[in-house]
Every structure is written in C-alpha cells, then in structure tokens.
Amino acid sequence: MAGVKLAVCAGGLEDPRKAVDDLAAEGVEAIEANADFFLTNSAGMVTETARILHDGGITIRSVHAPFGNQHSLSAPDEDVRAQAVETHAQLLRQCAYAGVSVIIAHPGTSEAPDRVAEMLDWCQQSLEELAPIAEQTQVRIGLENMLPNHPGTTGEELLRILDAVDSPALGVCFDTGHAHCNGDMRGVFEVVKDRIITFHLADNDGVGDLHFQPPYGTVNWIDFVSVFRTMELEYRDFMTVETPPWPGGGYRQLIGQVSAL
C-alpha cells in the first residue's frame, strides 16, 4: 500500500496545541475524531480547534458518529430513531465548521436481528432526512459495512439503502475488520467498491471485532491490497487505521507498518 495516505484515530482535541505537538512528533497528518467533542462544544470552539490543528499540519479528516442502540438510525423505537437523526444532523453541522470531509455512520445495531429488513427501511428513512443536510454542509456520510446480525452486513444491503436515497453526499465506509468477521471480505468489497468514499483498516481473528492494528490478526492483507487495486476510480484520499498502535509502538510505527502492506 505504498503511496496510500493514512489517518489515525485520535482524541485530545480539548487541548489542540498539545494534540498537534504529540501527533506531529509521530508523523501524523490526518485524524479521525469521535463525535463527543463536536456535540458538546460550541461552533466557535470547533472552528478554533480545527484552525489550530490545521496550522500545525493536522487535518481532522473524518469523525465517527455516535453508535449503539440509543443512537441507531434504524432503531425500532421511533422516538429513539428521531433523536438519532437529530444527533447526526447536529454532528454534520458542527463538522462543517471544522472542514471535516466525512462522518462515519453505522446503519444500525444488532438489537433486533430478526427485523433486519425493517431496520434497513428505517435506516433509509433516516438517511433521507440527513442527506439534504449532508449536501448543504458538504460533509459526506460514509455508511459502514457491519458485523453479522446487523443491518448493513452485506454489500447488497448497503447498496439497497444508497440506491434508494440516491444522494451524492452518501457513500460507503469499507471496514476491513467487519468484513473479515463476515467471512467474505473480497465479496463485500467487490459489491460496494464503486461507492466507497472512505476506509476503516483494522485486523482481528475473524470472530470478534478486536481492532488489532494491521497486520497483527488474520486478515489476508495481500488479498485486500489486490482487490483494492481493482477500484475503477483510483482512491487518493486518506484511509483511516481504526485501531490503536500495536503495544510497544506509536503512531509512527503504525503508519510505517500499515504502509508496508
């Protein structure tokens, strides 16, 4: 994967100058942040924090939206789902102040595995509300392929939602760890590859979503790189390593090892 730009997951935005010092020392150029900072601070604070990071050579490239039953875009409970939509809408607006390119959203949780078909419909309805906001703010939504027993496990399920909503602000966040747990990483990739707008690179044992740093699990990275190269439009943006560094190492080592795959 030589030549691919890598982002890392990092926090510490409450003290942006320290974050810049720490990240720059490790050779980090871009990060994925979690949503809490954006949802609990003012637009002015978000703007100023992003400016400090940008001046220090660090881009907040993506933000992971809240997830879990209480934040599910496909929650069976209509009130919970409405609140989840509002939270995602607020996040889109806040991320726009920081120049964030994409938020990562889960289609849903495993709270009702016997109702996945209905949950896909509810997720579609939620995204129909969010897509105009994403278009207006110019912050895209990357819908993540999920673990077994979740809506969005297969590539076909993701495309069903994206095709129905039909917005240029929506795409796929391809998660290698989730696809590996489903037993067919290449198959999922082949289905969604023309709709991928961002990546989560992670490794595991093929059973649990362990978030090991690549390549310390059982993902076939040679196979992944091979299928990655079949994308019709060459992917030139950052790919996020959604794991901590392997114990004993730092971000510089993580970036070096993943780049060498």
Predicted ranges, named:
Residues M1-K5, L13-G27, G152-L261:
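Histidine-acidic metal/acid-base catalytic patches
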Residues M1-Y97, V258-A260:
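N-terminal pre-domain/capping segments
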Residues C9-L13, N34-F38, A65-G68, G108-S110, ...:
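Active-site beta-loop-alpha junctions enriched in small/polar residues
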Residues E14-K18, D55, S74-G171:
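Active-site acidic/histidine proton-transfer and metal-coordination neighborhood
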Residues V20-E26, N41-V63, Q90-G99, E128-Q136, ...:
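Acidic (Asp/Glu)-rich catalytic clusters
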Residues E32, S62, I104, G142, ...:
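Conserved beta-strand positions in the central sheet of alpha/beta enzyme cores
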Residues A43-V46, L73-A75, R115-E118, T154-E156, ...:
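Short secondary-structure transition/capping segments
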Residues N69-A75, T109-V116, C181-N182, V207-F212:
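A short acidic, helix-capping loop that chelates divalent metal ions and anchors anionic groups
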